[in-house]
A protein has these predicted regions:
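Short helix-loop capping/hinge segments that flank enzyme active sites or metal/cofactor-binding pockets
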Residues: 1-29, 88-97
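Short, high-confidence coil segments that cap the C-terminus of an alpha-helix
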Residues: 42-44
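Glycine-rich, N-terminal phosphate-binding loop of Rossmann-like dinucleotide-binding domains
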Residues: 50
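Small-aliphatic-rich amphipathic alpha-helix that forms the alpha element of a beta-alpha
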Residues: 66-89
Length: 124
């Protein structure tokens, strides 16, 4: 059985038109172009928060979780949309909840990104 949120995404996906897919592809291509510019010099690693806020509380309203998921997608979809590796590290806590730092690497930088994550983790 799927949760409401997952079921809702399937229903939404079935309603997407070809023109909406084409428009989304234009947006995705724009993201890829921008990330190609960011990583053009080689050796770049982008550091960004893993999420926009600590994890939602158990029992939080669906509407609040939906809003959080939409805001988080701006951070969490970059790697998937561009084919780049991303790793998230638990860096600290805020009010007892983990706060993560994501490292986003260039195409093919997986091993370097893992090594960097290991160094950061060892230093904490």
């Amino acid at each position: 059985r799927l949760s409401f949120e997952v079921s809702d995404r399937y229903v939404l996906a079935r309603s997407i038109s070809d023109s909406q897919v084409a428009a989304a592809q234009v947006g995705r291509d724009s993201i890829v172009t921008r990330m190609n510019e960011v990583f053009a010099d080689g050796g770049t690693v982008v550091c960004l928060p893993s999420t926009v806020s600590p994890a939602p509380l158990i029992g939080q309203k669906v509407s609040a979780r939906h809003s959080l998921r939409l805001r988080n997608s701006a951070l969490t979809s970059i790697a998937g949309n561009t084919g780049r590796p991303q790793i998230s590290l638990p860096i600290t806590e805020l009010e007892g909840m983990p706060v993560g730092l994501s490292l986003l690497g260039d195409l093919g930088s997986d091993a370097m990104l893992i090594a960097m994550a290991q160094e950061i983790s060892a230093a904490l």
